[in-house]
């Protein structure tokens, strides 16, 4: 793998990890907000955040698969 591709892969991977870590923190806060407020909108936002986290995980797995394919 050339250096540019490797750097891009590592940067993308690090970015996904950062998004997931910050997302986990935000998710915990939103769980508290939804629980305390019992407002339907808070649960809607929480649900959207959970889906976004799952999507980022999928993208991370896709990135790893693409990296593996490039390195064949």
Language model: regions and residue ranges:
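Amphipathic alpha-helical protein-protein interaction segments
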Residues: 24-71
């Amino acid at each position: 793998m050339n250096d540019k591709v490797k750097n891009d892969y590592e940067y993308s991977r690090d970015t996904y990890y950062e998004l997931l870590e910050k997302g986990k923190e935000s998710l915990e806060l939103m769980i508290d907000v939804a629980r305390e407020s019992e407002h339907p909108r808070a649960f809607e936002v929480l649900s959207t955040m959970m889906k976004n986290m799952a999507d980022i995980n999928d993208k991370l797995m896709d990135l790893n698969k693409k990296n593996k394919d490039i390195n064949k």
